[in-house]
Curated annotation (Swiss-Prot):
Disulfide bonds: none annotated. It is an enzyme of class 3 (hydrolase). It holds the Pfam family Beta-lactamase2. The active site is at residues 91, 187. It comes from Nocardia asteroides. This is Beta-lactamase AST-1. Substrate binds at residues 151, 255-257. The keyword Lipoprotein applies. GO terms for biological process: beta-lactam antibiotic catabolic process; response to antibiotic. The class A beta-lactamase family has a specific amino-acid numbering system, sometimes called Ambler or ABL numbering and often misspelt as Amber. A multiple sequence alignment was used to derive a consensus sequence and then the consensus was numbered taking into account insertions and deletions. This allows use of identical numbers, e.g. for active site residues, despite differences in protein length. UniProt always uses natural numbering of residues, hence there appear to be differences in numbering between this entry and some papers.
Length: 310
């Protein structure tokens, strides 16, 4: 079965956003679809987290603004630094987009086996997989694989279309209970990361909570949760970020982002042997537009997280 990925009509997007806001944004718990999820996106939640002075020292030595939120889902212990400040979302949205589609369309429906067709005119910068598949199209499953494992930007845009664009994607976050994160633009415009610009931003606490809900919580059914985990574990773009700061025997799934202003972003779920998962979001950005991202900063911040959580 084939179809073209066309955006939802404007009225449909408005209705979806309004419904999500009415149902979920006023409470920070959501019973939408399956499961109830509490999303720690407010100051009152993160004020109880451990604040480690080593994060401030890393900021001084790196010249970057650093945001961290991590939670041990077994003990409930958390570590935070600038956890409620806004940072660019960039390509970290791609894992959440696939999670939203899995939530709407269980694997048993066959939705992820449908072929999406797109034109060469829709290709954007850095699309290593989709640029080779213009003639054949790609299944939704293949688009998620490309968007998460190699961060293919055209694949990300096709997934956004299926959700009703940036507005529909944001509505899906609201239905999780995330009243903070927002996506306003498409790839690659969403990567400007201008300091003080709230478009296309999230916070470490909100981003970690969203990934926790989808990968560890009961928002998704077991088959869908396993599929999202498999895509994240297969990611090839994060070897020098959070993964580099974790013990070698931990299983790790993550999604990175690298927008302008030297921003280095990573959000991960890690499974230590014999322990409950740990969810970690480490986000950084700099003041110069053409600065280089500091992958080593994210790795070192992760080492601090592991030490602080014990």
């Amino acid at each position: 079965m084939t179809f073209s990925a066309l955006p939802f009509r404007r009225a449909d997007r408005r209705r979806l956003l309004a419904a999500a806001l009415a149902a979920c944004a006023l409470t920070l718990t959501a019973a939408c679809d399956s499961g109830t999820v509490t999303v720690p996106v407010t100051d009152s939640v993160t004020t109880s987290a451990v604040a480690d002075p080593r994060f401030a020292e890393l900021e001084t030595t790196s010249g970057a603004r650093l945001g961290v939120f991590a939670v041990d889902t077994g003990s409930g212990r958390t570590v935070a630094h600038r956890a409620d400040e806004r940072f660019p979302m960039a390509s970290t949205f791609k894992g959440l987009a696939c999670g939203a589609l899995l939530r709407e369309h269980p694997l048993s429906t066959g939705y992820f086996d449908q072929v999406i067709h797109y034109s060469a005119a829709e290709l954007v910068e850095y699309s290593p997989v989709t640029e080779t598949r213009v003639e054949t199209g790609m299944t939704v499953r293949e688009l998620c694989d490309a968007a998460i494992t190699v961060s293919d930007n055209t694949a990300g845009n096709q997934l956004l279309k299926l959700l009703g664009g940036p507005e529909g994607f944001t509505a899906s976050l609201r239905s999780l209970g995330d009243a903070t994160s927002r996506l306003d633009r498409w790839e690659t415009d969403l990567n400007t990361a201008i300091p003080g610009d709230e478009r296309d931003t999230t916070t470490p606490a909100a981003l970690a909570a969203d990934y926790r809900a989808l990968v560890v919580g009961d928002v998704l059914g077991a088959p869908e949760r396993d599929q999202l985990k498999a895509w994240l574990v297969a990611n090839t773009t994060g070897a020098t970020r959070i993964r580099a700061g974790l013990p070698a025997d931990w299983t790790v799934g993550d999604k990175t982002g690298s927008p302008a202003y030297g921003s280095a972003l990573d959000v991960a779920v890690a499974w230590p042997p014999g322990r409950a998962p740990i969810v970690i979001a480490v986000l950084s950005t700099k003041s110069e537009q053409d600065a280089e991202p500091d992958n080593a900063l994210l790795a070192e911040a992760t080492r601090v997280v592991v030490d602080a959580l014990g």
